[in-house]
Swiss-Prot record:
<keyword id="KW-1133">Transmembrane helix</keyword>
<dbReference type="InterPro" id="IPR001320">
    <property type="entry name" value="Iontro_rcpt_C"/>
</dbReference>
<feature type="compositionally biased region" description="Low complexity">
    <location>
        <begin position="922"/>
        <end position="938"/>
    </location>
</feature>
<dbReference type="GO" id="GO:0038023">
    <property type="term" value="F:signaling receptor activity"/>
</dbReference>
<feature type="topological domain" description="Extracellular">
    <location>
        <begin position="672"/>
        <end position="830"/>
    </location>
</feature>
<feature type="glycosylation site" description="N-linked (GlcNAc...) asparagine">
    <location>
        <position position="59"/>
    </location>
</feature>
<dbReference type="GO" id="GO:0015276">
    <property type="term" value="F:ligand-gated monoatomic ion channel activity"/>
</dbReference>
<feature type="glycosylation site" description="N-linked (GlcNAc...) asparagine">
    <location>
        <position position="39"/>
    </location>
</feature>
<dbReference type="InterPro" id="IPR044440">
    <property type="entry name" value="GABAb_receptor_plant_PBP1"/>
</dbReference>
<comment type="similarity">
    <text>Belongs to the glutamate-gated ion channel (TC 1.A.10.1) family.</text>
</comment>
<keyword id="KW-0406">Ion transport</keyword>
<feature type="transmembrane region" description="Helical">
    <location>
        <begin position="831"/>
        <end position="851"/>
    </location>
</feature>
<comment type="function">
    <text>Glutamate-gated receptor that probably acts as a non-selective cation channel. Involved in root development. May regulate cell proliferation and cell death in the root apex.</text>
</comment>
<keyword id="KW-0472">Membrane</keyword>
<keyword id="KW-0732">Signal</keyword>
<feature type="topological domain" description="Cytoplasmic">
    <location>
        <begin position="640"/>
        <end position="650"/>
    </location>
</feature>
<dbReference type="Pfam" id="PF00060">
    <property type="entry name" value="Lig_chan"/>
</dbReference>
Length: 938
């Protein structure tokens, strides 16, 4: 036992010595640099927070034992050149890491120096998304990248249903790169930046006003403002003067606004009045213990600050505080891994010679790569929440508060997180649940928008540039009821035009427009070329009989269809005379066969049920066969003479007569239709038979039917013939394929209906083989298409759409076209139509026969017992057993064929004969039971 104690003591001594050696190997102080701009709001807060963090770390024995952080701070005063010089000064004095800079633009330059000298550059405010760890490995962003902020803004735009936005931003790396990221995120959501309005850093009030005037002339009323606080506040002041912070506008400012407002002890009411209804974002931080401790002693920290100004703690101050702790944890791990603070000359700098340049003072941090690795491996709970990096070098769990500026303060209306999107529940609560970013879960509280309204801004208006939107209309030469252009006056009219004008008049805002004809006035134009004019910006919209098809929806947006359409087959037809065998046409062959079989089945079933009790169903076999046929078919006319006496027989007859009544009524109605309505026939039965044949097919010039037949259905181009007018339709069909015409025409239903109204001798065969409609075409993501769709639905609901239809097309045109549609199997009834009736009747027959058979077997068993009791005993041999079965079958069939009354009479006679001879049988007497069986008594 003492030996074990000695070993344990030796082990503890060795560990203590090793630890002492490890600690003693650490330097007494580690030099770190920090760069701020005290003339900025973020810089003032961050400077105090960094000093507080250094003091807390140096007074904490659990972190960096035996080593103190030696902080050296420089004030760049937002001067980029000065910031670069100060960074060089840090690197001349063996600095292991630099906290800062504030500016993304400065960070781009300093990151190159950090990469060369292996000094980690840890910035808590450089949010430019292009400052990636791939290009700048020694740049460490200790705040949330603008990549996530722009994702949050894009989610806001999608949540409110806006498709176009205008961006105003400062024209530097910070502004340009963030807006570029926003554009990428919006495109993923089928939205876009309509207009980008940059302004130079330090722009004057007049310059910003000029930018805003251009923005006001754009159609988008959703404005994203990404700027520095100084210039951003000027934007709001000038926008208020121009009336741009009013009803109809929606403003979203990035987190620069909250970074300016949050530190303010007293919010300036005059300043807030310039941004009423603005939405902005704020970095979301959890309520951690370290955050509470820092907030509670903030006022004391301000007294120690040399600035003597009062301001509150902001989220950037929390990130600055966590940055120092992040570096401390990394240095602790660095020393624990055996790292040493040492520097060596950069051989590349030795090759550069220059008077007055002290380049040899710049040295490479030998342990920089190891320290960088330890920084990326930190994992602790800081003032902002969990501090940890993902594989891309970004802090985990990026989140923002969505803040609304209203009245004299700020109101949080929701949250955004990369985990669950928009929500009214805090992100740290949602982290405990499975991720869910469905549309139903994306929620925010109500927002009061500019103009003090709770109604969400529409987000766009027509641009205030005095220009009208150009609307292309097809200059048709046929079917001009739908759309036509007067060659003399240039007036555009037709059903499509009236629908468009009626829909435009329902909009809540004016739409300046003018119609521009498209075509050569000799033949119908190509509608595909007309749609392409929208893509090339020759037209702002297309109005006409434009079919909504898949290929077109990929390049333009369509409104709600205002006319239903679809491709049909039109062909010549011949009259079909009724003929002498017309009475057979109401039923199909299968229906005739099944009906005839059921007549025979019913006759047979009734004969089986009535044969033993009804003399009308007895007699010689020939007579019985005739009776079965006569009885079954006479039920067709309800003229059967034979009386049914059994209950089961009557049950079957009742059901069968009901079936006969239905069949007879249907037959009469169908035959009447066949004999009184003109029947038409055609060798073409629909699109399938048309494709498989080799006959030529006509189509309308300019229609999509040509491409559909050739590309989708595989019809050879040599079979397709272009036709330009109803007259050409009629002529081609009259000639037929043998004389240079066509066998059929494939076109859209509205045109065919109009053609059939004037030419009733033709007909549509088969059914529509495509389903589509006509709509108005607009550029992709055009908000006008959405509003017009709503207006078209309103026209349909209030009946105006039908009234416009009746104005241009005859009211009875539809009924005429429907009457001209050809059914290749008119009014013929199939078995399927009566399957339920036949099934019920069949089940009734089976049920009746089952009961009848059970009753018959029961009667036979009693009869056999009376006739020969020994026959019921089992036979001894196989031969006798076979004879017994044959005799039993013959006996049963004989019994089933006999009249039931005869069997009862014979049983009674036998019973009375046995009773009369009772005196000579040794006192044995027999009595007859009520059921015809006999019992013996001694």
């Amino acid at each position: 036992m003492k030996f074990i104690f000695y070993l344990f003591s030796i082990f503890c001594c060795l560990c203590s010595c090793a630890q002492s050696q490890n600690i003693s190997g650490r330097p007494d102080a580690v030099r770190i640099g920090a760069q701020f701009a005290r003339n900025s709001t973020i810089g003032r807060v961050a400077a105090v927070a960094v000093l507080a963090a250094v003091n807390d770390i140096n007074n904490d024995s659990n972190i960096l034992p035996g080593t103190k952080l030696d902080l050296h701070m420089h004030d760049s005063s937002c001067n980029r050149f000065l910031g670069i010089v100060q960074a060089l000064q840090f690197m001349e004095k063996d600095t292991v890491a630099i906290i800062g800079p504030l500016s993304s633009t400065t960070a781009h330059v300093l990151s190159h120096l950090a990469n060369e000298l292996h000094v980690p550059l840890m910035s808590f405010s450089a949010t430019d998304p292009t400052l990636s760890s791939l290009e700048y490995p020694f740049f460490v962003r200790t705040t949330v990248s603008d990549q996530f902020q722009m994702t949050a803004v894009a989610d806001l735009v999608e949540y409110y249903g806006w498709k176009q936005v205008t961006t105003i931003f400062v024209d530097n790396d910070y502004g340009r790169n963030a807006i570029s990221s926003l554009g990428d995120e919006l495109s993923k959501r089928r939205s876009k930046i309509l207009y980008k309005a940059p302004f130079r850093p330090g722009a004057s009030n007049n310059e910003i006003a000029d930018v805003l005037i251009k923005v006001a002339m754009m159609e988008s009323r959703v404005i994203i403002l990404h700027a520095n606080p100084d210039s951003g506040l000027v934007v709001f002041q000038q926008a208020l003067k121009l009336g741009m912070v009013s009803n109809g506008y929606a403003w979203i400012a990035t987190d620069w606004l909250t970074s300016y407002l949050d530190p303010s002890v007293h919010l300036d009411i005059g300043l807030l009045s310039t941004m009423q209804g603005v939405l902005t974002l704020r970095h979301h931080t959890e309520n951690t213990r370290r955050k509470s401790m820092l907030s509670s002693k903030w006022s004391e920290l301000l007294k120690e600050d040399s600035g003597h100004s009062r301001f509150l703690l902001s989220t950037y101050g929390l990130y600055a505080y966590d940055t120092v702790w992040m570096l401390a944890h990394a240095l602790d791990a660095f020393f624990n891994s055996g790292g040493n603070i040492s520097f060596s000359p950069d051989p590349k700098l030795n090759e550069i010679s220059g008077r007055g340049l002290n380049l040899e003072a710049l040295s490479v941090f030998d342990g920089g790569q190891l320290l960088l690795e330890k920084i990326h491996q930190v994992d602790f709970l800081g003032a902002t929440g969990p501090v940890k990096f993902d594989s891309g070098g970004n802090l985990i769990q990026p989140a923002y508060d969505i803040v609304s500026i209203i009245g004299s303060g700020l109101r949080t209306v929701g949250y955004w997180s990369n985990y669950s999107g928009l929500s009214v529940i805090s992100p740290e609560t949602l982290y405990k649940k499975p991720a869910n970013r469905t549309r139903e879960t994306q929620k925010l509280h109500d927002v009061i928008w500019p103009g003090e309204t709770i109604n969400k801004p529409r987000g766009w208006v027509f641009p205030n540039n005095g220009n009208e939107i150009k609307i292309g209309v097809p200059d048709r030469v046929s079917y001009r009821q739908f759309v036509s252009v007067d060659s003399e006056t240039g007036m555009v009219r037709g059903l499509c035009i009236d629908v468009f004008v009626a829909a435009i008049n329902l909009l809540a805002y004016p739409v300046p427009y003018r119609f521009v004809p498209f075509g050569n006035n000799r033949e119908n134009p190509s509608y595909s070329e007309l749609i392409n004019k929208i893509i090339t910006d020759d037209f702002d919209a297309v109005v006409g009989d434009v079919t909504i098809i898949t290929n077109r929806t990929k390049v333009v947006d369509f409104t709600q269809p205002y006319v239903s359409s679809g491709l049909v087959v039109l062909t010549s037809v011949k009259r079909q005379n009724s003929g002498g065998w017309a009475f057979l046409q109401p039923f199909t062959i299968k229906m005739w066969t099944v009906t005839g079989l059921f007549f025979l089945i019913i006759g047979t079933v009734v004969w089986m049920l009535e044969h033993r009790i009804n003399d009308e169903f007895r007699g010689p076999p020939a007579k019985q066969l005739i009776t079965v046929f006569w009885f079954s078919f006479s039920t067709l006319f309800f003229a059967h003479r034979e009386d049914t006496r059994s209950t089961l027989g009557r049950f079957v007859i009742i059901i069968w007569l009901f079936v006969v009544l239905i069949i007879q009524s249907s037959y009469t109605a169908s035959l009447t239709s066949i004999l009184t309505v003109q029947q038409l026939t055609s060798p073409i039965t629909g699109i399938d038979s048309l494709i498989t044949s080799d006959v030529p097919i006509g189509f309308q010039v300019g229609s999509f039917a040509e491409n559909y037949l050739a590309q989708e259905l595989g019809v050879a181009h040599s079979r397709l013939k272009a036709l330009g007018s109803p007259e050409e339709y009629k002529k081609a069909l009259d000639l037929g394929p043998s004389k240079g015409g066509v066998a059929a025409i494939v076109d859209e239903r509205p045109y065919i209906e109009l053609f059939l109204y004037q030419n009733p001798k033709f007909a549509v065969v088969g059914s529509e083989f495509t389903k589509s409609g006509w709509g108005f075409a607009f550029p992709r993501d055009s908000p006008l298409s959405v509003d017009l769709s709503t207006a078209i639905l309103e026209l349909s609901e209030n009946g105006d759409l039908q009234r416009i239809h009746d104005k241009w097309l005859a009211s009875d045109m539809s009924s005429m076209s429907q009457a001209s549609e050809l059914d290749q199997d008119p009014d013929r009834l199939d078995v399927y139509s009566f399957s339920a009736l036949f099934l019920i009747c069949g089940l009734a027959c089976i049920f009746a026969l089952a009961i009848h058979a059970c009753n018959l077997f029961y009667q036979y068993s009693r009869h056999a017992a009376e006739e020969d009791p020994a026959a019921l005993q089992p036979s001894a041999s196989d031969g006798s057993r076979s004879l017994s079965r044959r005799s039993k079958l013959q006996s049963f069939l004989s019994f089933a064929d006999r009249r039931e009354a005869d069997i009862r009479r014979a049983a009674k006679e036998k019973a009375s004969g046995l009773g009369g001879s009772g005196g000579s049988m040794s006192g044995v007497s027999f009595t007859s039971s009520g059921s015809g069986s006999t019992t013996a008594s001694c």
